[in-house]
Every structure is written in C-alpha cells, then in structure tokens.
Swiss-Prot record:
Listed name of the protein: 3-hydroxyacyl-[acyl-carrier-protein] dehydratase FabZ
PANTHER family found in the cross-reference section: 3-HYDROXYACYL-[ACYL-CARRIER-PROTEIN] DEHYDRATASE (PTHR30272:SF1)
Function, as annotated: Involved in unsaturated fatty acids biosynthesis. Catalyzes the dehydration of short chain beta-hydroxyacyl-ACPs and long chain saturated and unsaturated beta-hydroxyacyl-ACPs.
Family designation: Belongs to the thioester dehydratase family. FabZ subfamily.
Keyword set includes Lipid metabolism: yes
EC category name: lyase
Gene responsible for this protein: fabZ
Length: 161
C-alpha cells in the first residue's frame, strides 16, 4: 500500500506529496464505487498540480452498455476523473477541515476526446490549477494513455461548506 510521502518545502516552493492511495483519496472526497474514478494520485504539488491514475478494467459497470462488442469508457467519465483528481488536490491543499466536502462542477470548456479508452488502459490524468479565488478553482486537465493524449478540458469547480 502506498504511503503519503511529503517533501518539505524549500524556501517559497509549495509542499509536494509523492503519492497517495485510494484510501487517502476516499478520505478527501466523498465518491465511492462505482463512481470513484481514480485509484491513486502521484506527483502532487499542493495548490498547483497533480496526476491521478485510473486503471480501466473490463468489470466496470458502464462497459455493459457502452458498448458490449467494443467497450469504450464514456468521455464524460474521463472528465469526471479529471474533476475527482482536481477535487482531491483542492482538499489536500486546503487541509483536513475540507475532507469529505463536496466539490461541484461550475463550467466545462473546450472538452476534446482524441481516442477511445478501454479495458486494460491506464489513464494518467494531469490537472493543473489555472487560478483560484475564494472557494472557486479553475483547472486544465489532460488525460493520457501510454503518453498519448486521449482527452482534455478546462473546468471550474466550487467547494461547498
């Protein structure tokens, strides 16, 4: 099991966390199976960026109907995985008082889906904060499989008390 590993800040640089496992993600956000769409996070820079990892498996419920002969992960679920990665980053940044709080989508802009994602793929979801003001955060997200971009979007969300 992965452990949360913090790297102390040097000067004014933000705090980094090497990796967190799914149990720590579930402490941060309220999502649960079958709608918890990230398995692990790595390369976390608090207040700035993170990478979420989703191991796509054939047993996921959406593949029963999307599409049985050629399973494709719905694009909206890839965007949701970006949002869950960003929400976890927000909670880790703001601290324990925000654990389990809801983070709601406000906008999704420029969503592009470049290639299908299916069973056996590993999504690496890179999110980077573009800006934040009070409880509203805006992110750019890019999902990749084997280093190739499969989806991207810019989105904003609000953390609710």
């Amino acid at each position: 099991m992965d452990k949360e590993v913090e790297v102390p800040p040097a000067g004014d640089s933000p705090t980094c966390i090497e990796a967190i496992d799914v149990m720590r993600i579930m402490e941060a956000i309220p999502h649960r199976y079958p709608f918890l769409l990230i398995d692990r996070m790595v390369d976390i820079v608090l207040g700035s960026s993170a990478v979420g990892i989703k191991n796509v498996t054939a047993s996921e419920p959406h593949f029963q109907g999307h599409f049985p002969a050629r399973p494709v992960m719905p694009g909206v679920l890839i965007i949701e995985a970006m949002a869950q990665t960003a929400a976890t980053l927000v909670v880790l940044t703001l601290g324990p008082a925000f654990e389990g709080k809801l983070v709601y989508f406000m906008t999704i802009d420029g969503a592009k889906f470049r290639r299908p994602v299916g069973p056996g793929d590993q999504l690496r979801i890179h999110v980077e904060k573009e800006r934040s003001r009070a409880n509203v955060w805006k992110f750019k997200g890019i999902a990749r499989v084997d280093g190739v971009s499969v989806a991207e979007a810019t989105f904003s969300a609000m953390i609710m008390g």
